[in-house]
Amino acid sequence: MISIEGIRSGINKILVLGNHEGIIQSILDFDYLSGKRERSILGIVTGRSGFAKYFWGRKEILIPTLHSVNGFTDLPAQAGLRLNEHNIWLLNLLSGRRTLLSTEEFLKHLPLAYGAALFAENVPELHSQNLIKLGSDSSKLIVGPASVGLLVPGVLKLGPIGGITPVQINESHLTERGSVAVLSASGGMTNELINIATGGGARLSFALSVGGDRFPVLSPRDAFILAEQDPATKSVLYYGELGGEDEYDLVKLKEEGKFTKHVIAHIAGTVSSLFPESPQFGHAKAKADKDRVTASAKREALTKAGFAVSNSFSEFINLASKLK
């Protein structure tokens, strides 16, 4: 698997599928505020060949737009880049039903790419299973579907993670490197955890949203291994929820000695016990169809394994605010 340190030590370039002006501009703002000399976005597939206007600081710039993924292969060379000397990423902003085919096509044309962030929700579950196999077979770092992306402060902003305005980027200190990793399936809660951590004075080593669909390509277990293997990461801030077995995979990692770093965790969804039948919450997996996957059972298992687990979200905020 790709390492976070490998991302930091390389030059990262992004190819975008789909035209979402706010997200694209936020990446350019992040690059500019991080003090980079050049933008990280190489080009955008919009369905037509030409250029799109964006801003680099106060200066207006033109970014190449392409008719299809086929045109991606020429962009690195046109920009004077050698693929084996740069980390090439895909930011896929297309709809759920187009996510699989377009990601496959991208990796077919750029097999040396580092990985991808898949933004769309409601990717068909069969497509998600194929994406998981694609990620495993290719050893790429792929977050999503239904992910706000991947952030390595001062280095890479792959998606809307952390916010899409310069004010959000500055106030969350997204350009400053630190030692706290933020991990969650939820995109909204990933951004909230970033605000909580940095608002308390901590700075991030990296942050990622695994993705809110039922079958994410990168599992929470994989994300924790990334944090364990990252020398800059000292602590992990994790937000989970009822449903699924992910937290038991984390317990196993801890018990086997494969994860050793400090974790502050919150598992949401204890309110489900107040209903005659467990309700379906916002994310696809957020439903406790058996006692083992209730929020209370997961909290207990994580606590026994040695994780610092909060009993309320206010307690979670208090614990997180003490991270430095």
Model regions and ranges:
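Catalytic-core regions of core metabolic enzymes
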Residues: 1-324
